[in-house]
Amino acid sequence: MKYYWFIFCKTDLLLEKVGNNYTIPLSEEPPIALRPWTHVMNIGPTEDGTEVKAFMIDSPVTDNPNYEMCGLRPSFYLLSTELYLKAGKCHELLYWDQNTKFCGVCGAPMKMHTDISKRCTNCAKEVWPQLATAIIVLVHKGDEVLLVHARNFKSDFFGLVAGFVETGE
């Protein structure tokens, strides 16, 4: 069975070059060697039923001409919408996995309980990925739209007004 392999080094995603296009590696085995301690996460399948796996690597792949590392945001311009959205989900779950290795109650190691939950090996506390509710607002006047440009944007990229919603708002 072939899997899509979403492989991240920090926030950079491994892309496979196919002619003049880019995609996520699709193969039976991971396209790069796994370390013994690498945790491979099972992520929900794509719309066509192809299974998805994701993991983190410590250093970027630079020695293989078939692959290129690309930031998650810039990959929007290189991947299909479905694969880009799946990449975002994979990164979210890998970040959660990296930051929930130990129980917040007793400090014992956490172990995967389901594909998206962990259980403490000592006190049985369960944790799931947290939701960070955010809003995006379209401010318009007639045919004009208010767009914002943050200083940390790397190009002439503009977006709608957005922010996080606090509990009770």
Positions of the model-derived regions?
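N-terminal alpha-helical interaction blocks
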Residues: 1-81
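Residue-level signature for short turns and capping positions that connect secondary-structure elements
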Residues: 59, 152-153, 165
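Conserved hydrophobic/aromatic beta-strand scaffold that supports enzyme active sites
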Residues: 42, 54, 102, 136-138, ...
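N-terminal strand-loop-strand
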Residues: 114, 121-160
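Short acidic-hydrophobic surface loop/beta-edge motif
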Residues: 41-46, 118-120, 139
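Acidic, metal-coordinating catalytic segment for phosphate/diphosphate chemistry
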Residues: 87-135
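The catalytic Nudix box helix
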Residues: 159-169
